Amino acid sequence: MENRFEISMLIDYYGTLLTEKQFNVMTLYYNEDLSLAEIAEINKTSRQAIYDLIKRCCKQLHSYDEKLKLSKKIDKRYRIKEELMAELNKNSNLDEDIKKYIDEKLEEIINA
């Protein structure tokens, strides 16, 4: 299957666009690390049906991301945050508590 971390992130971003069954299967496979056989048993279906559903969902999630570009936007925000924090640490005599506060606020902006 595809990069587990990448798909897990796409599930976080676009999981609400999947059906409940699709979301549950994808979560079990990518986030809970259950095998195809275990998921098939839970859903009372075949291993092949679960495999096919996962492949379809991966394509669907990638399609959403190609159109909405949410993962690229979030990656860019994290890069900007890292650049800002590097500059703060390099050029500033700010107190560590203030740096931590700024870091937390930047994280809130990214996740808003």
From Swiss-Prot:
InterPro entries found in the cross-reference section: RNA_pol_sigma_r3/r4-like (IPR013324), UPF0122 (IPR007394), UPF0122_fam_protein (IPR054831), WH-like_DNA-bd_sf (IPR036388)
Domain of life: Bacteria
Family the UniProt entry places it in: Belongs to the UPF0122 family.
Role: Might take part in the signal recognition particle (SRP) pathway. This is inferred from the conservation of its genetic proximity to ftsY/ffh. May be a regulatory protein.
Protein name (record): UPF0122 protein CPF_1968
Organism of this sequence: Clostridium perfringens (strain ATCC 13124 / DSM 756 / JCM 1290 / NCIMB 6125 / NCTC 8237 / Type A)
Source species taxonomy: Bacteria, Bacillati, Bacillota, Clostridia, Eubacteriales
